[in-house]
């Protein structure tokens, strides 16, 4: 009864509806809205797939299905060209849990998620965050978390200046310190 009363007295009479996607694990790792295309959003799930909507969430479609990995840690849209997406695989452990899906590195799409190219960094296992340069979509920083429960020397911050053709680790503390 209290819930109904509070709902009715909400400013602007906001009404929430379930818009999906609904066939997933419910562990959202990343959500990005396209700054250049109103109504276009991407949602990445920790244990399965990347979904896209172009109509403010009324309809969703999976756009990362045929890849050799399930876990996703982050997605980034290039600010200077929103058709360019970077996807970091491997759940990021932003939430406290005992099981996470490992990944296979970083992927790039130049067509809004229709097709994907694998860019390497397979040994990083879990990508926590991706940042794309505001004016040059080929300059990207990736926070690699490595293996969570065993030794891992692939942790650190990686940078590419050529769209993922080559990666350089620009920060590494030790095998116990995740990015």
Please identify what each model-predicted range represents.
Residues 1-179:
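Beta-propeller blade termini and top-face loops
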